[in-house]
Swiss-Prot record:
This is Bifunctional protein PyrR. It is an enzyme of class 2 (transferase). It comes from Staphylococcus epidermidis (strain ATCC 35984 / DSM 28319 / BCRC 17069 / CCUG 31568 / BM 3577 / RP62A). Homodimer and homohexamer; in equilibrium. Its EC number is 2.4.2.9. Belongs to the purine/pyrimidine phosphoribosyltransferase family. PyrR subfamily.
């Protein structure tokens, strides 16, 4: 199957810059702002957005990773109970404005799992959602506050995000 490039390296960089500016406008600066990237590619994107915000505001926004593995609705409930804290960040996110970062927003189930993981032990002031790509086909009533690119797709198509940190290239492709 051939791939169709939707975003190349330069387009991804511009998109991250725009999302960073939108997050700053949404939050009116960096006060109480925390970024949580959904493992794996969302975490790398969160750090890229953190770097961009730092270059704009000269403020290092606390950034961490959230692993939703044990909060997915397609795993055994016994496994779900084993996980106490699914996020890795060095600040308390209670009473903070948390922005969840994901690479592709599709059915909404990954985002729902991340909300479950966050709200199990903490109470942020507000939670926002940023996605590099929104491909539609939602199964839950979830919408991103910040979207890099809306890509209408067929259900049988696959949207892949490649990031140089793990894939040795930057691209968003439909396969």
């Amino acid at each position: 199957m051939s791939e169709r490039i939707i975003l190349d390296d330069a387009a991804i960089q511009r998109t991250i810059t725009r999302i960073a500016h939108e997050i700053l406008e949404y939050n009116k600066g960096t006060k109480d702002l925390v970024l949580l990237g959904i493992k794996t590619r969302g975490a790398f994107l969160a750090h890229r957005i953190q770097d961009k915000i730092n270059s704009i505001e000269q403020q290092l926004v606390p950034t961490g990773t959230i692993d939703i593995t044990h909060f997915r609705d397609d795993v055994d409930k016994v496994v779900q109970q084993a996980d106490q804290r699914a996020f890795d960040i060095n600040v308390d996110i209670n009473n903070k404005v948390v922005v969840i970062i994901d690479d592709v927003l599709y059915t909404g189930r990954t985002v729902r799992a991340s909300l479950d993981a966050i709200l199990l032990h903490t109470r942020p002031i507000k939670i926002g959602l940023a996605a590099l790509v929104d491909r539609g086909h939602r199964e839950l009533p979830i919408r991103a506050d910040f979207v890099g690119k809306n890509i209408p797709t067929a259900r049988d198509e696959s949207v892949s995000v490649y990031l140089e940190e793990i894939d040795d290239r930057n691209a968003v492709v439909i396969e």
